[in-house]
């Protein structure tokens, strides 16, 4: 298995620290607002990778943190006239809800920053003792970037160039404009914790260093996050952790590509910013997940109605292949392994989901061909298609339930009409029963009568 390591800037053979085990950390959400489509892109990308590692037999420990204390959280809570706790708890629940709808697996561990304050304080104390950090005149503690010789190795920038192009706010108590805060002194009315430097709260960057150290150790296999976090967040994590622990922080770095909207950067100022909930009001979670998983994880992805409609058509092609056929493992044909080998070859090469999906469509075509000529063989291929779709986390909805949703179909109204038709048949009003069947047929709804009742599906 090879994949692109942002640290080296090239594809590398993956070698875990411990055989058959993977320790992976993914930077989580700062829960000051609803999750947006960019979050969905990032966490679906890493969910696919997590699922693929498990499919390949690895025991994966995935840590995905929650940043539950931050300037943005305090600002938003004040604007809303609520406590930071109320804001955070509501947004964490909303995040969990939309992630579940998108079929994103729960991480092995999901630490909150506020649960790891003692570990952050301990790391900062170590950095001060080693000369990598200092306390400013106003009490804030800063990281001394000039002390860390490798600063810039992840973002491929040297410190001198960073200083010249810096847009960092100049703070008088900093020794260097690039120095970043490790501990902020408390302001009136803000959440605060005790520390050797006085009551305050941690800086953003130290949070991830402390949480990963606590749960995965000083060195772990993979650190993942959105490409927008590469600098300064991930660069600062490396500086903190490697100075404190005197060893490599993470061996491999994975960065997911950003979402563009109609080829423009997504931002609230451009009025092209979409929350996940807003997108799911228009498109089924299957479609959204497929769309976001269909591009190589580290490439930019263009959010547009056209691309989502294409994703919808693709999802329906795969679902239609599995319609009216029962997946049966024991019916797997001898040549089925060829499809699985092609799938593995694609995913082993930097998690190439477009090539992996091409294999799934080849399987779907085979199933459609065999449905009328060899149902036994078709059912074996259907099992394999289901299995490989699960690796990508797609086709997680019941087939008929999927086809009952969307396109203006009101399931409750259809159920009412079916109930009325059933009663009409009991009353021997067959003209009305036929009228309802024809009415639904014109809407693309097919009724299937059986001894146990009437079911329906979209044609």
UniProtKB/Swiss-Prot annotation:
Keyword Protein biosynthesis belongs to the record: yes
GO cellular component: cytosol
Coiled-coil region: none
Keyword annotations: Aminoacyl-tRNA synthetase, ATP-binding, Cytoplasm, Ligase, Metal-binding, Nucleotide-binding, Protein biosynthesis, Zinc
Motif ('HIGH' region): 29-39
Names of the cofactor(s): Zn(2+)
Pfam families: CysS_C, DALR_2, tRNA-synt_1e
Documented EC number(s): 6.1.1.16
Residues engaged in binding ATP: 268
GO biological process: cysteinyl-tRNA aminoacylation
Annotated residues for binding of Zn(2+): 27, 208, 233, 237
Location of the protein in the cell: Cytoplasm
CDD domains for this protein: Anticodon_Ia_Cys, CysRS_core
Segments carrying motif 'KMSKS' region: 265-269
Molecular-function annotations in GO: ATP binding; cysteine-tRNA ligase activity; zinc ion binding
Database matches in SMART domains: DALR_2
Reactions the enzyme catalyzes: tRNA(Cys) + L-cysteine + ATP = L-cysteinyl-tRNA(Cys) + AMP + diphosphate
Top-level taxonomic group: Bacteria
Cofactor remark: Binds 1 zinc ion per subunit.
Recorded family membership: Belongs to the class-I aminoacyl-tRNA synthetase family.
Subunit text: Monomer.
Protein name: Cysteine--tRNA ligase
Organism (species): Francisella tularensis subsp. novicida (strain U112)
């Amino acid at each position: 298995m090879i994949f692109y390591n942002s640290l080296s800037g090239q594809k590398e053979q993956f070698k875990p620290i411990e055989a058959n085990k993977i320790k992976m950390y993914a930077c989580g959400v700062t829960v000051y607002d609803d999750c947006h489509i960019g979050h969905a892109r990032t966490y679906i990308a890493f969910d696919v990778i997590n699922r693929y590692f498990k499919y390949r037999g690895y025991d994966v420990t995935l840590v995905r943190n929650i940043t539950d204390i931050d300037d943005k959280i305090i600002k938003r809570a004040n604007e809303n006239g609520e406590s930071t706790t109320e804001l955070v708890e509501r947004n964490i629940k909303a995040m969990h809800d939309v992630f579940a709808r998108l079929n994103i697996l729960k991480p092995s561990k999901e630490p909150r920053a506020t649960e790891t304050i003692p570990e952050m304080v301990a790391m900062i104390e170590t950095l001060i003792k080693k000369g990598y950090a200092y306390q400013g005149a106003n009490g804030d503690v800063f990281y001394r970037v000039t002390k860390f010789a490798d600063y810039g190795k992840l973002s491929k920038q040297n410190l001198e160039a960073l200083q010249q192009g810096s847009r960092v706010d100049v703070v008088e108590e900093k020794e260097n404009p690039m120095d970043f805060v490790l501990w902020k002194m408390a302001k009136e009315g803000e959440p605060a914790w005790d520390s050797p430097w006085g009551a305050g709260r941690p800086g953003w960057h130290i949070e991830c260093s402390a949480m990963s150290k606590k749960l995965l150790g000083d060195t772990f296999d993979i650190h993942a996050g959105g490409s927008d976090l590469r600098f300064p967040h991930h660069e600062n994590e490396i500086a903190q952790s490697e100075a404190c622990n005197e060893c490599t922080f993470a061996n491999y770095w994975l960065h997911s590509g950003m979402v563009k909207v109609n080829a423009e950067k997504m931002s609230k100022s451009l009025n092209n910013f979409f929350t996940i909930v807003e997108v799911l009001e228009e498109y089924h979670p299957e479609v959204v997940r497929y769309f976001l998983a269909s591009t190589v994880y580290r490439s930019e992805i263009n959010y547009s109605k056209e691309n989502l409609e294409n994703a919808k058509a693709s999802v329906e092609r795969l679902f239609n292949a599995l319609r009216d056929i029962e997946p049966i493992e024991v019916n797997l044909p001898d040549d089925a392994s060829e499809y699985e080998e092609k799938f593995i070859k694609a995913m082993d090469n930097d998690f190439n989901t477009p090539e992996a999906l091409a294999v799934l469509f080849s399987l779907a075509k085979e199933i459609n061909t065999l449905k009328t000529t060899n149902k036994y063989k078709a059912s074996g291929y259907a099992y394999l298609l289901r299995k490989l779709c699960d690796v990508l986390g797609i086709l997680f909805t019941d087939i008929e339930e999927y086809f009952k949703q969307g396109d203006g179909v009101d399931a409750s109204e259809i159920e009412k009409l079916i109930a009325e038709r059933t009663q009409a048949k009991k009353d021997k009003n067959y003209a009305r029963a036929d009228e309802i069947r024809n009415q639904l047929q014109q809407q693309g709804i097919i009724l299937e009568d059986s001894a146990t009742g009437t079911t329906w599906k979209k044609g």
